[in-house]
């Protein structure tokens, strides 16, 4: 089996580690030539996973034509949601090379202008390729260190999805197939915003009871959006790895970028400076704007998510935000 990963950030690199154990080769592509040269020379992604050495069968490249021409079993799209459309458009004219190759999307969130989820963006631009979502509780560093995790591969084609899940799973990197591609993406999008709220509560030293309150209310908001987008709620999605599992992981440790961001806010940091100076993408920050627009369009209320939006972009005081989310 050959696999190709487009996106050499922390998660794309970690997935390369996971797939290297049962692939003859893994292509890891990134658009920045200098960064990819550094990874190739050092056999480490010094920017994101500096302590993890790449296995020899991971081939590092900044040449997208080269990696797409390698006829992979599947292509993994591992870029932030707000960059996903640009990536798909950049390979659209090469679709004849990888036509019908399954695309596994790791992006989490909602696109700013279109208010589309990642699978909807991919299906719009690359309609001939089966699209799946790969999501669940999975910190990149732990995947790269071969620590156990269980995540979900969601898509409409059950036979193909089940086959891919079996091929890319190994002893520590376990994949569960689900047909609920929408529910999985809703959980993935909202959990990052809820994690910011949990971080704020943690930064203010309000205790574990308060964190549990935010997680519980956050789960209800995931359910609210899910019901508004699809009346046939799948309970196994809500209580499975991609919703409840990912929510718990992201909301209970400072290893989560989103929770860490919230902790810093709770400790009194200047929010505008944080928004302008943060070098790493905080998915909850980039998701909350389109989410609130989508909620208005669907005529639903998401109190915690709205409170985080108002704090970040409407200058609502921190104490008022804490009161609202609790």
Swiss-Prot record:
Gene name, Swiss-Prot/TrEMBL: gpsA
Annotated catalytic residues: 191 (proton acceptor)
Gene3D superfamilies from the UniProt entry: N-(1-d-carboxylethyl)-l-norvaline Dehydrogenase, domain 2, NAD(P)-binding Rossmann-like Domain
Role description: Catalyzes the reduction of the glycolytic intermediate dihydroxyacetone phosphate (DHAP) to sn-glycerol 3-phosphate (G3P), the key precursor for phospholipid synthesis.
Gene Ontology biological process terms in this record: carbohydrate metabolic process; glycerol-3-phosphate biosynthetic process; glycerol-3-phosphate catabolic process; glycerophospholipid metabolic process; phospholipid biosynthetic process
Keyword terms of this UniProt record: Cytoplasm, Lipid biosynthesis, Lipid metabolism, NAD, NADP, Nucleotide-binding, Oxidoreductase, Phospholipid biosynthesis, Phospholipid metabolism
Signal peptide start-end: none
Binding site for NADPH: 10-11, 31, 108, 140, 257, 281, 283
UniProt EC number: 1.1.1.94
Protein species of origin: Ehrlichia chaffeensis (strain ATCC CRL-10679 / Arkansas)
Protein name per the record: Glycerol-3-phosphate dehydrogenase [NAD(P)+]
Top EC category: oxidoreductase
Coiled coil (UniProt feature): none
Family: Belongs to the NAD-dependent glycerol-3-phosphate dehydrogenase family.
Intracellular or extracellular location(s): Cytoplasm
Catalyzed reactions: sn-glycerol 3-phosphate + NAD(+) = dihydroxyacetone phosphate + NADH + H(+); sn-glycerol 3-phosphate + NADP(+) = dihydroxyacetone phosphate + NADPH + H(+)
One Gene Ontology cellular component annotation held by this UniProt entry: cytosol
Known pathway: Membrane lipid metabolism; glycerophospholipid metabolism
UniProt xrefs under PANTHER family: GLYCEROL-3-PHOSPHATE DEHYDROGENASE, GLYCEROL-3-PHOSPHATE DEHYDROGENASE [NAD(+)] 2, CHLOROPLASTIC
GO MF annotation, one: NAD binding
Source organism phylogeny: Bacteria, Pseudomonadati, Pseudomonadota, Alphaproteobacteria, Rickettsiales
Top-level taxon of origin: Bacteria
Any matching Pfam family: NAD_Gly3P_dh_N
């Amino acid at each position: 089996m050959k696999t190709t990963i487009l996106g050499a950030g922390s998660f794309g690199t970690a997935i390369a580690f996971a797939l290297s154990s049962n692939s003859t080769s893994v292509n890891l592509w990134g658009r920045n030539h200098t960064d990819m040269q550094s990874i190739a020379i050092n056999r480490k992604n010094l920017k994101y996973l500096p302590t993890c050495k790449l296995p020899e069968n991971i081939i590092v490249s900044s040449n997208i034509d080269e990696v797409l021409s390698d006829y992979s079993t599947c292509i993994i799209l591992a870029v932030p949601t707000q960059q996903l459309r640009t990536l798909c458009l950049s390979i659209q004219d090469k679709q004849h090379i990888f036509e019908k190759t399954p695309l596994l999307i790791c992006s989490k969130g909602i696109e700013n202008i279109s208010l589309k989820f990642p699978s909807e963006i991919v299906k719009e631009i690359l309609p001939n390729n089966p699209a799946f979502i790969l999501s669940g509780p999975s910190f990149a560093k732990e995947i790269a260190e071969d620590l156990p995790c269980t995540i979900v591969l969601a898509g409409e084609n059950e036979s193909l999805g089940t086959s891919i899940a079996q091929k890319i799973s190994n002893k520590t990197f376990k994949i569960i197939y689900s047909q609920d591609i929408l529910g999985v993406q809703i959980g993935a999008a909202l959990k990052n915003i809820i994690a910011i709220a949990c971080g704020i509560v943690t930064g203010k030293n309000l205790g574990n009871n308060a964190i549990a309150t935010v997680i519980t209310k956050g789960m209800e908001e995931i359910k609210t959006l899910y019901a508004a987008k699809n009346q046939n709620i799948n309970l196994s999605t809500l209580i499975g790895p991609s919703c409840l599992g990912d929510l718990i992981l992201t909301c209970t440790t400072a290893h989560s970028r989103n929770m860490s961001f919230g902790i810093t806010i709770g400790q009194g940091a200047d929010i505008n400076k944080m928004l302008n100076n943060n070098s790493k993408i905080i998915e909850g920050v980039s998701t909350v704007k389109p989410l609130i627009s989508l909620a208005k369009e669907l005529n639903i209320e998401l109190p915690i998510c709205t409170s985080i939006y108002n704090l970040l972009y409407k200058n609502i005081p921190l104490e008022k935000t804490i009161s609202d989310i609790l």
